[in-house]
UniProtKB/Swiss-Prot annotation:
One of its GO terms (biological process) is L-histidine biosynthetic process. PANTHER family: IMIDAZOLEGLYCEROL-PHOSPHATE DEHYDRATASE, IMIDAZOLEGLYCEROL-PHOSPHATE DEHYDRATASE HIS7. Pfam families: IGPD. CDD domains: IGPD. It is an enzyme of class 4 (lyase). Signal peptide: none annotated. Belongs to the imidazoleglycerol-phosphate dehydratase family. It catalyses: D-erythro-1-(imidazol-4-yl)glycerol 3-phosphate = 3-(imidazol-4-yl)-2-oxopropyl phosphate + H2O. Keywords: Amino-acid biosynthesis, Cytoplasm, Histidine biosynthesis, Lyase. This is Imidazoleglycerol-phosphate dehydratase.
Length: 196
């Protein structure tokens, strides 16, 4: 019997954004991302490459206002797609963690796909904006993602000076933590409750 593909397509349209995401968890890291926010595209491309996820993402947002709605809504839709692609989560490892360096920067991420939304985020950035992405939105991105992923995320920049390096290390740590958490390691739902 063939395994069912772990994939999802999610569309969300509001007065602020129009977003379509197609995600495959068991991919090869290819992506086509156009969020309208250049640095967010770069981070999501890195995330997919290192997690091994395939992602097509299109967002048409009210960037004439600022990047808030686009960044937040991209995270909400991506989190929903991850949740849908995971199905009942049978056989997944559930937990993942990684510590990733990028030059002088060092970031840590731990993930629990256990069905409870929570985000602990510890990082400070010197630059307020990088290529259209307000750095204050990095935390908001991960908080919004945790909400619709129904996951607990702990993210922390442990060292570093360069804002680009610190944010990229966070996204790559998240990628490797997610790669582990979604990996199939058994047949059962990884919880004594019998569901997550």
């Amino acid at each position: 019997m063939a395994e069912q593909a772990r994939t999802a397509t999610v569309k969300r349209t509001t007065k602020e954004t129009d977003i379509t995401v197609t995600l495959t968890l068991d991919g090869n890291g290819t992506s086509a991302i156009a969020s309208g926010v250049v640095f967010l595209d770069h981070m999501l491309t890195n995330f997919c490459k290192h997690a091994g996820f395939n992602l097509t993402l299109r967002c048409n947002g009210d960037l004439d206002v600022d990047d808030h709605h686009s960044v937040e809504d991209v995270a909400l839709v991506l989190g929903t797609a991850i949740t849908e692609a995971l199905g009942n989560k049978s056989g997944i490892q559930r937990y993942g963690w990684a510590i990733i360096p990028m030059d002088e920067a060092l970031a840590r991420c731990a993930v629990d796909l256990g069905g409870r939304s929570y985000c602990v985020f510890k990082a400070e950035f010197r630059r307020p904006v990088i290529q259209g992405l307000s750095t204050e939105m990095v935390e908001h991105f991960f908080r919004s993602l945790a909400d619709t992923m129904k996951a607990t995320l702990h993210l922390e920049v442990l060292d570093g000076n360069n804002t680009h390096h610190k944010i990229e290390a966070l996204f790559k740590a998240f990628a490797y933590a997610m790669k582990a958490a979604v990996s199939i390691t058994g047949n059962d739902i990884p919880s004594t409750k019998g569901l997550i």
